[in-house]
Amino acid sequence: MAQPPVVAKPESSPSSAGNQLFACKSIDKLISDAEDPGHRLKKTLGPWSLTALGIGAIIGSGIFVLTGTAAAGEFFQAPSILHAQVLDLIVNFLKGGGTASVLMHGRPPAGPSIAISFFLVAIACSFAGLCYAELASMIPIAGSAYTYSYATLGEIFAWIIGWDLILEYVVSNVVVAIGFGAYIKAQLASFGLDLPDRWSTPVWESGHWTGSYFNFPAFLIVFILTVLLVRGVKESAEANNVMVAIKIGAILIFLIVGGMLVNPTNWKPFAPSGFSGIVTGGAIVFFTYIGFDSVSTAAEEARNPQRDLPIGIIGSLIICTLLYVGVSIVLLGMMKYTTFVSGDAAQAPVAYALEHLGANRFARSVIVIGALMGMISSLLVFQYGQARIWYAMSRDCLFPRLFSAVHKKFKTPHISTWIAGFAVGIPAGIFAISDAADLSNIGTLFAFVLVSLGVILLRRKQPDRPRAFRVPLVPWFPLVSIVLCGGLMTGLTVITWIRFVVWLVLGLLIYVFYSRKHSEFCKTRG
């Protein structure tokens, strides 16, 4: 096991606990800590591997599912005020209305214009993406938004966003792992191989025991990926490159096969609900773009981070946008958007369209494989990023030093990787938490807000510091990012906000009773 980190003197020595909360760590100190031989990670990633990490994180199975839902629109009733959207409650309160109307949710159909929705959402995400690109090239450290906040906003904000990122990565991957388990179980059943429910379904669901012993497929996929990540980042990146290539190949095959089945009359009317349908469609598909920020967690393993991190972040966004727009144009040309309102057509629109229009079994099988690769690569990248967040927080002494241990042979943060694996694998084997999936979304948006704010602050505090990539039109572009992400946060439900606040309060208690006392700044002050 690697030796414990040497605690070096931070940029400043806060004279009080209050000053410590807002003390920023210098960028030079952050970089020098990363070069400590006892904690140095192996630099093996180039621009394609970084771009593939972004694509692997962004494109899951959603491209094969949400396109139809957003095109067809949806209408449902929330079971209680806790499941109402915060924005709806605010608007309704200002109008002086009752709560009944707030519980009724409706999104008009975007129809074929969902292609425009994908394009507009990509532009919205690019504002945050540009901010990540500037800070990632300027502060090439594994902690992503956590590290950027430590350098710009202070220790307490760094802790909050680090704790928030843990929530984002854990919840997201638990949900994906459970989805993978259910998907692989269904696919095996189609070949006559039935996995016993007691070993392939959640133990606890909707507040009661199910009679299952353990969701073994969900746990197994996380365990296998954890072993791969411990073995080395080069091996993990190569595996991700292969899965991304298969995933992109599956999408391209769909575009070719589906393109031959397009009936142009299905594109009329192009925008059945006008601009409102385009906007609400964008709200549904926005979260299919989340994941590009995970590229920044690979900063310390990139061969040329100043050049390649912006390429990975922006390149993955561009490639995914082209694929999303292409799939939406072809899918909505194959069948009328009203087809995808309910049933199998709503659950798996791409597979449904191929099957009902007589596509051969090979094309349908490719889509199944593409969806599986999408889930596995997403799991891999987020598990990778999660371990790097914990590693960075441990190196700053906000987490126990054990988390920043680096394997002597593989040069990976193996302890953090194993802990991250079990933190996801065990809950995935026991619980069904799909209703908590929005916790990942609110955590991501919160990180986007702080990173965008960090760009503005660093431009003011260190305007002459070299930047390999610069966000244009500062502060306007970062401000647009803050407004858009903040607005999307209000579109989430009340229960999501409550859970998010409870998680942050729990994190603050840990900070007060442990992290604050072990921080480098505290030791310097002492």
Question: In which residue ranges do the predicted regions lie?
Answer:
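Membrane-interface "cap" regions at the ends of multi-pass membrane proteins
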Residues: 2-111, 130, 141-142, 464, ...
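Helix-loop-helix junctions that connect adjacent transmembrane segments
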Residues: 26, 32, 36-42, 82, ...
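Select transmembrane alpha-helical segments in multipass membrane proteins
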Residues: 43-54, 113-116, 154-167, 217-221, ...
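Extracellular loop-to-transmembrane helix junctions
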Residues: 63-206, 316-319, 326, 503-508
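Membrane-helix boundary/coupling elements in multi-pass transport proteins
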Residues: 64-67, 127, 141, 164-182, ...
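TM-loop-TM module centered on a large, flexible mid-protein loop between adjacent transmembrane helices
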Residues: 77-109, 147-148, 154, 186-197, ...
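Hydrophobic alpha-helical segments of multi-pass membrane transport proteins
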Residues: 186, 251-254, 390, 440-467, ...
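C-terminal membrane-solvent junction of multi-pass transporters and transport-like membrane proteins
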Residues: 210-214, 272, 402-414, 448-497, ...
